[in-house]
């Protein structure tokens, strides 16, 4: 068991849980912990931004997926459950945005990776539509739904 947080981390009701609370909890429960100094991302000459989950979410919302990928050191991804989607006639699936708890990029068309294959992802005001780039369908790609969850990697 291990916890790593920033030196200025706060959470809980009115930010009542801080690093001293985490340290006490960790020591009381045999959990290893580290508190790390902030890390900054160089935006432009003389301008740095502190890297945080809030900053990464803002990059995704602004459609700066390459910046989000650079900050995460991996593609930005969204996890979806098969049972929350509806299969469509073209072998793809549709998901209501209201059932997705992760931040999504703005409405538009994206080429992404699902099950190591390229897919076309269309994000509308109401839903996410995933269409295979090949003549297969997502259920085939997932070995007939043996996977309950899949991940969309935005490239």
Per-region residue spans from a language model:
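Classical nucleotidyltransferase
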Residues: 1-92, 153-155
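Phosphate/ribose-recognition catalytic cores of enzymes acting on nucleotide-derived substrates
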Residues: 75-78, 83-155
